[in-house]
Amino acid sequence: MAKQIRYDHFLHGGDYNPEQWLDRPDILKKDIEYFKKAHINTVSMGMFSWAVLEPEEGRYNFDWLEDVINNLYKEGIYTILSTPSGARPKWMADKYEEVLRVDPDRTRRFFGGRHNHCYTSPVYREKIYNINK
């Protein structure tokens, strides 16, 4: 049974995608300032970060994620970690064409866009399993 956590306040926030600004620590710092001004105490992260979390097949980088989460926590901001399956990395589409979605007219979609994947692809399912471990 899942542990129930009770808070004495509402969790308030939204999606946060800091991976697009990793080369700009000044922006990441400013984000936290803005969050505090808006009384944001919770962010969800990771939903579109797969390409940064696994830049090459089998090579994972979670250091940046840990740093961002720690910096948020120091400022009283909680993190809800999402699965990064919203946008898979380009290397996957290049190497495994079968992970790309096929439309009803049997046209295979090109890489790009969110949720453009074939949910029944065994390769896609394996890669999702691996990144979520």
Language-model segments: what does each one mean?
Residues H12-D23, F48-W64, F110-N130:
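The substrate-binding groove and active-site-proximal loops of carbohydrate-active enzymes
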Residues M1-P25, Y34-N41:
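An acidic-aromatic substrate-binding cleft motif
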Residues L28-R109, Y129:
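Aromatic-lined substrate-binding rim segments of carbohydrate-active enzymes
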Residues M1, F10-H12, Y96-E98, R106, ...:
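Generic structural motif recognizing short loop/turn segments at the entrances and edges of beta-strands
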